[in-house]
């Protein structure tokens, strides 16, 4: 602030000094008034209460009121104390002398003075400083808006870069779905070759086919869970396979039965139901691997029947000792503990026999090895003797 504003403030400060001198009772000693104004009371400690002046004792010298100073003086003094430049702002500009700043601004209890300053009217200073502050606030607001717009633009650009482009959902044709369903009925986990063949048939990328199979497997598992929690049976058992492919269940005594199903035993009426469903035209709903399971079961049943027939044709005559032991076991009822002890003894005897056999085989192998080594040594010694005789002759 320079020019007329500075002259007005200096005149107001001079008037305030003259008023202070008259209030002091016409004291001709100016040093006492300056010392009473400029020297603030010393702070006793560095605590929060001491800094804020909460525990401060009332000073002996009367504190000068705000009414004795003009509006511009205490405003500049408060700005110089609270601003980042400190006290030197007002002093360096020449508006306020080094002794012109009153003592209550430098005291720790400046909060009370600032609260009292709300009742003071600052009309003459607001008229002169108002346009400048308005321009400064407008410029600062515009700078803030521009900086915020720049930050928003940068953040939007970074977010647009980070966001991945969303892929459009593929729409399968009926032909593609038919081919995929056929492949899924043949194998739930197709290999690379099968996926390549499907890609050539359906003209779809291989990654899309892989994703379709993943989704189809998830859908199939969900269905199996809803159908009586038969996911395990649907994977390995016959009951789940029949439920999955809508094959009629076998009927006994007028009611469908499921007690005869297991992983390795296939009832005869299961084959009949499969063949009936195939003849009636439900072949499309029946998976080909189901018929493969039926064929394998028939083959295994044929092998087992052949083995049983061979065993019956060449019966082995049991030894008389074993027959007598069996008769004794059947005649004499034994408790569970006796049976357990006998079984443990039999196991121990078998273990001893096995260990003896192993030791016998090991000992025989050692003897054979020793015999071979002695034979090779004898042959080598004979060859050496023959060579020495030839040399001597």
UniProtKB/Swiss-Prot annotation:
The keyword Acyltransferase does not apply. A motif (Nuclear localization signal) lies at residues 150-154. The keyword DNA-binding applies. Residues 319-341, 365-393 have a biased composition (Basic and acidic residues). Disulfide bonds: none annotated. A motif (OAR) lies at residues 342-355. Its main location: nucleus. This is Visual system homeobox 2. It comes from Danio rerio (Zebrafish).
């Amino acid at each position: 602030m320079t020019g007329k504003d500075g002259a007005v403030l200096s005149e107001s400060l001079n008037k305030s000094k003259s008023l202070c001198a008259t209030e002091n009772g016409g004291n001709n000693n100016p040093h006492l008034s300056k010392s009473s104004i400029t020297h603030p009371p010393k702070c006793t400690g560095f605590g929060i209460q001491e800094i804020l002046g909460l525990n401060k004792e009332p000073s002996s010298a009367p504190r000068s009121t705000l009414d004795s100073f003009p509006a511009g003086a205490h405003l500049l003094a408060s700005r110089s104390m609270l601003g980042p430049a400190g006290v030197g702002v007002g002093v360096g500009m020449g508006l306020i002398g080094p002794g012109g700043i009153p003592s209550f601004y430098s005291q720790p209890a400046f909060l009370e003075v600032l609260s009292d300053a709300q009742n003071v009217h600052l009309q003459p200073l607001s008229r002169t400083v108002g346009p400048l502050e308005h321009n400064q606030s407008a410029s600062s607001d515009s700078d803030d808006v521009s900086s915020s717009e720049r930050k928003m633009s940068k953040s939007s650009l970074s977010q647009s870069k980070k966001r991945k482009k969303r892929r459009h959902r593929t729409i399968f044709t009926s032909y593609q779905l038919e081919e995929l369903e056929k492949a899924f009925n043949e194998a739930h986990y197709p290999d690379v070759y099968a996926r390549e063949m499907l890609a050539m048939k359906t003209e779809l990328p291989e990654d899309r086919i892989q994703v379709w199979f993943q989704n189809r497997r998830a859908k199939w598992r969900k269905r199996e869970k809803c159908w009586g929690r038969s996911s395990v049976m649907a994977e390995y058992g016959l009951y789940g396979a029949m439920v999955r492919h809508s094959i009629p269940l076998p009927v006994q005594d007028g009611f469908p039965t499921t007690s005869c199903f297991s992983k390795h035993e296939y009832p005869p009426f299961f084959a009949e139901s499969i063949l009936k469903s195939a003849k009636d035209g439900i072949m499309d709903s029946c998976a080909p691997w189901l018929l493969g399971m039926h064929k394998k079961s028939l083959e295994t049943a044929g092998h087992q029947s052949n083995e049983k027939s061979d065993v019956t044709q060449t019966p082995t005559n049991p030894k008389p000792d074993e027959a007598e032991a069996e008769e004794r076991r059947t005649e004499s009822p034994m408790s569970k503990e006796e049976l357990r002890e006998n079984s443990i003894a039999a196991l121990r005897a078998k273990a001893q026999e096995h260990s003896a056999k192993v030791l016998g085989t090991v000992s025989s192998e050692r003897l054979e090895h020793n015999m071979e080594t002695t034979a090779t040594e004898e042959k080598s010694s004979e060859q050496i003797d023959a060579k020495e005789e030839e040399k001597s002759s």
